[in-house]
């Protein structure tokens, strides 16, 4: 599903609505992870699917009349993992998964490590979190904050312009 289009994911956590609306295109596929649909209802957006254990979805009957609702009740995976396991896309733009609680932030790091075949960008307030490709180059304005956190064995050959060098990391 969606294997040719980028997909927007909405979780139950805090969503910077202004940031989301700047990026979201009305014809883009959108999937709510469980109660993420509650955010979309306030914006009058109907997701293509709602996937999760549905423990935080408000008014399930309303949604069942509007879109496909997939209930996966197992507690061995998070709602985000349930969504990723049931969708395929070139890129995912994910809102509402990080920031509210530290364990949720750790969980997205786990997801980035576990789902290496998925290209996911998490939007968390002023931060974006994503797994770097094998080769990456970026030019940023001076004083831009950037953090590099290895999730697997990695090697940075060279860095340039950083306050603290990470060469040969």
What are these regions (language model features)?
Residues 1-3, 22-25, 63, 87, ...:
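Solvent-exposed alpha-helices and their adjacent loops that cap or buttress functional pockets
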Residues 122-134:
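Short, flexible loop segments at boundaries between secondary-structure elements
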Residues 19-21, 104-108, 132-135, 159-161:
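A short secondary-structure junction signal
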């Amino acid at each position: 599903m969606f294997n040719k289009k980028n997909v927007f994911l909405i979780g139950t956590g805090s969503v910077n609505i202004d940031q989301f609306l700047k990026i979201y295109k009305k014809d883009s596929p959108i999937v709510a992870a469980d109660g993420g649909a509650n955010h979309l209802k306030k914006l009058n957006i109907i997701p293509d699917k709602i996937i999760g254990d549905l423990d935080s979805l408000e008014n399930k009957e309303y949604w069942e009349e509007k879109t496909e609702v997939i209930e996966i009740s197992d507690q061995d995976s998070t709602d985000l993992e349930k969504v990723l396991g049931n969708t395929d896309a070139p890129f995912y733009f994910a809102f509402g998964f990080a920031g509210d609680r530290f364990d949720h932030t750790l969980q997205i790091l786990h997801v980035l490590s576990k789902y290496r075949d998925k290209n996911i960008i998490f939007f968390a307030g002023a931060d974006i979190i994503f797994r770097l490709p094998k080769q990456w180059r970026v030019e940023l304005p001076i004083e831009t904050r950037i953090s590099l956190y290895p999730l697997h064995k990695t090697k940075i050959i060279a860095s340039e312009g950083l306050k603290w060098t990470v060469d040969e990391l």
